[in-house]
């Protein structure tokens, strides 16, 4: 194999010489232009005129060729100059890598990580992200799985200064990876990876549960916590087989918790949202003389992740994630608490909306007609999360999350032709309760209570089937209390009852928070 050695300084010197030569040639060409392109005839006869024109044409041709050569010369000189710069840059890069290699070699040999540099991202073979340099560098990101059932890789942590790597997403039905921690002096935590969605169930089989979101990484002395990953959705349940009821949908994964903020200063990370529960499988038509099968229950929604707590000295608590919808909806996460000196509490997450009830199967038609199946009742709506507490000295409490809405009950199945009775509608469930507002610091106001969710409506009956009952409205959350100086938080309003054969009752409004001991106004109660 042959090798080429290039000396950047010599290339730069040669390019300068070429530029000087080109300038000299161009000056000579311009000086000769007047004497060679505009010749006067030696006499007034035609022969002299033709001779002058001939030599002037040769001069103009030379000038055209000279211009082309000058352009080529400029291009060649520019290419040589660029090559010299490229060789010099490559040489400098190699020197930098060699110096970093010498610096990192001792710690790499002793501790298995460099002194300076970013950690490697995870791969399918090694899904976890590598740690950043002990002195400086970010953690590598975790690998997002493409194979069902495999947990996402965790993000690598930083050393002294740097951000943690993000967690990888989980494969189908698997949890997301946690985010890496930020540098212990300065740096934010990495975000958690999302949970994988659960696959749908086959006929007669329930849906598969979704994976939970990964937790956000925590910061060190200064920095913000990473956000929690979202929970994966549950898979849809399979349809009933052989006259059986539809199967249950898969439960959703919970959202990951937000990471804690820096110990001296930093905000808590946001909690991840809970996943949506899988839809229940359909009920099938009944056999002759049998009642149609009921629809399957929806999977539970995932709980929203809690917001991360703030730094010990100052910082705001992280907002919580929202609960996922589903058969039984997920509750909202709680807001993160603020630091000791100053900061506001995080907002509580809203409760998830309950999944609608499945429709009942139709009765079989024929000589011995069957009755329609009853529509499925809805699940519970999620409660709102509580607001985070404020800092001990200065700060306001976080607002409570709103309760989830109740959903409509399932419609009854139609009776079989020839005398079958239609099924009754399913009952709507109660709305979720609102979360309580967070407590204030010595100087600050309490957080507002969350609003209660409205109750679900009763499902429609088929034919002569009765309509389902409405669900009650959720109660409003209590307002947060003030401490020394400040106003109490207002109570949340109660949700409205749902309509139905027996209408639901409206929820009760939450109590207002108490005023500060020295000054302030009490919170207004909810309606």
Swiss-Prot record:
Residues 264-384, 472-527 are annotated as: Disordered. Gene3D superfamilies: HP0062-like domain. Residues 264-286, 292-384, 472-515 have a biased composition (Gly residues). InterPro entries: PE-PGRS_N, PGRS_rpt. It comes from the Bacteria. Pfam families: PE, PGRS. Residues 1-93 form the PE domain. Belongs to the mycobacterial PE family. PGRS subfamily. This is Uncharacterized PE-PGRS family protein PE_PGRS20. The lineage of its organism: Bacteria, Bacillati, Actinomycetota, Actinomycetes, Mycobacteriales.
């Amino acid at each position: 194999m042959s090798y080429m050695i290039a000396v950047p300084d010599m290339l730069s010197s040669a390019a300068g010489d070429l530029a000087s030569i080109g300038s000299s040639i161009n000056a000579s060409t311009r000086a000769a232009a007047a004497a060679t392109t505009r010749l006067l005839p030696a006499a007034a006869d035609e022969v002299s005129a033709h001779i002058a024109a001939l030599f002037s044409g040769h001069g103009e041709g030379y000038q055209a060729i000279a211009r082309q050569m000058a352009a080529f010369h400029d291009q060649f000189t520019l290419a040589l100059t660029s090559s010299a710069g490229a060789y010099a840059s490559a040489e400098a890069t190699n020197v930098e890598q060699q110096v970093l290699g010498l610096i990192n070699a001792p710690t790499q040999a002793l501790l298995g990580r460099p002194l300076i540099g970013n950690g490697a991202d995870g791969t399918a073979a090694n899904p976890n992200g590598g740690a950043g340099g002990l002195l400086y560098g970010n953690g590598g990101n975790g690998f997002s799985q493409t194979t069902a059932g495999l947990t996402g890789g965790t993000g690598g942590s930083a050393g002294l200064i740097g951000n943690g790597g993000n967690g990888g997403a989980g494969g189908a039905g698997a949890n997301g990876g946690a985010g890496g921690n930020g540098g212990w002096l300065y740096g934010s935590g990495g975000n958690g990876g999302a949970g994988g969605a659960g696959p749908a169930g086959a006929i007669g089989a329930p849906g598969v549960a979704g994976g939970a979101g990964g937790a956000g990484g925590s910061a060190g002395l200064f920095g913000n916590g990473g956000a929690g990953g979202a929970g994966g959705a549950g898979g849809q349940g399979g349809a009933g087989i052989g006259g059986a009821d539809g199967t249950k949908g898969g439960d959703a994964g919970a959202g990951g918790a937000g990471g804690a903020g820096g110990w001296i200063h930093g905000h808590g990370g946001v909690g991840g949202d809970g996943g949506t529960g899988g839809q229940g499988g359909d009920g099938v038509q009944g056999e002759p003389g049998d009642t149609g099968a009921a629809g399957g229950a929806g999977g539970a929604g995932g709980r929203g992740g809690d917001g991360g707590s703030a730094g010990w000295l100052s910082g705001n608590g992280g907002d919580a994630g929202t609960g996922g919808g589903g058969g039984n909806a997920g509750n909202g996460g709680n807001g993160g608490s603020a630091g000791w000196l100053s900061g506001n509490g995080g907002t509580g997450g809203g409760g998830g909306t309950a999944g609608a009830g499945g429709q009942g199967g139709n009765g079989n038609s024929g000589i011995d007609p069957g009755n329609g199946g009853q529509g499925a009742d809805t699940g519970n709506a999620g409660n709102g999360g509580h607001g985070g507490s404020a800092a001990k000295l200065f700060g306001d409490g976080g607002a409570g999350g709103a309760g989830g809405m109740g959903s409509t009950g399932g419609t009854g199945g139609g009776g079989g032709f020839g005398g079958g009775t239609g099924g009754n509608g399913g009952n709507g469930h109660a709305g979720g309760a609102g979360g309580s507002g967070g407590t204030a610091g010595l100087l600050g106001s309490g957080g507002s209570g969350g609003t209660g969710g409205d109750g679900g409506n009763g499902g429609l009956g088929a034919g002569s089937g009765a309509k389902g009952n409405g669900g009650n409205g959720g109660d409003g959350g209590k307002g947060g209390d003030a401490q020394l100086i400040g106003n109490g938080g207002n109570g949340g309003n109660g949700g409205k009852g749902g309509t139905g054969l027996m209408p639901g009752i409206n929820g009760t409004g939450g109590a207002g928070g108490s005023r500060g001991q020295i000054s302030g106004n009490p919170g207004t109660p909810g309606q």
